[in-house]
């Protein structure tokens, strides 16, 4: 599987985050469920909707590899599904209590801000 991106809503098509750029994202994370026809979304394990947008720096190791690579493919305002195998997520360690070792994950991600450029 590796990393796959499926666009749900197009962004502005011109502003893409680069390594070192701070970004703000809304997201919901799900365990991968092959039997679910809705983008293989399994059990929800986390969401920024309860805490507010996640702030991270692309390429700085702030987030999992699948996000570092997947979010760089997005443009400002885009909403996408990022589906990733375990090596792009939490790997052999998983995230105890939430994510099993080597688990594939599905994230619904919305890119709200790049550096100082936000949605109007």
From Swiss-Prot:
Designated name of the protein: FK506-binding protein 1B
Residue ranges occupied by any PPIase FKBP-type domain in the UniProt entry? 20-115
Q: Locate the region Disordered.
A: 1-26
Record-listed E.C. numbers:
5.2.1.8
| Keywords associated with the record | Isomerase, Rotamase
For this UniProt entry, the molecular function terms from Gene Ontology, in alphabetical order, are: peptidyl-prolyl cis-trans isomerase activity
Q: Where is the signal peptide?
A: none
Entry's PANTHER family? FK506-BINDING PROTEIN 59-RELATED, PEPTIDYL-PROLYL CIS-TRANS ISOMERASE
Please summarize the record's notes on activators and inhibitors of this protein. Inhibited by both FK506 and rapamycin.
Q: Which organism is it from?
A: Aspergillus fumigatus (strain ATCC MYA-4609 / CBS 101355 / FGSC A1100 / Af293) (Neosartorya fumigata)
Q: Which Pfam families match?
A: FKBP_C
Q: Name one GO cellular component term.
A: cytoplasm
Q: What's its job? A: PPIases accelerate the folding of proteins. It catalyzes the cis-trans isomerization of proline imidic peptide bonds in oligopeptides.
Q: Which SUPFAM superfamilies match?
A: FKBP-like (SSF54534)
> Which family does this protein fall into?
Belongs to the FKBP-type PPIase family. FKBP1 subfamily.
Superkingdom to which the source organism belongs = Eukaryota
As its record notes, the protein acts as a catalyst of:
[protein]-peptidylproline (omega=180) = [protein]-peptidylproline (omega=0)
| Gene that produces this protein | fpr1B
């Amino acid at each position: 599987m590796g990393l796959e991106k499926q666009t749900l809503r197009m962004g502005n098509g011109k502003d893409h985050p680069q390594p070192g750029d701070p970004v703000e994202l809304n997201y919901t994370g799900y365990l991968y469920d092959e039997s679910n026809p809705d983008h293989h979304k399994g059990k929800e394990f986390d969401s920024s909707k309860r805490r507010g947008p996640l702030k991270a720096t692309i390429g700085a190791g702030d987030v999992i590899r699948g996000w570092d690579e997947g979010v760089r493919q997005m443009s400002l305002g885009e909403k996408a599904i990022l589906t990733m195998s375990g090596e792009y997520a939490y790997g052999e360690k998983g995230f105890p209590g939430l994510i099993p070792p080597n688990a594939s994950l599905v994230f619904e991600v919305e890119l709200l801000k790049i550096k100082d450029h936000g949605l109007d």
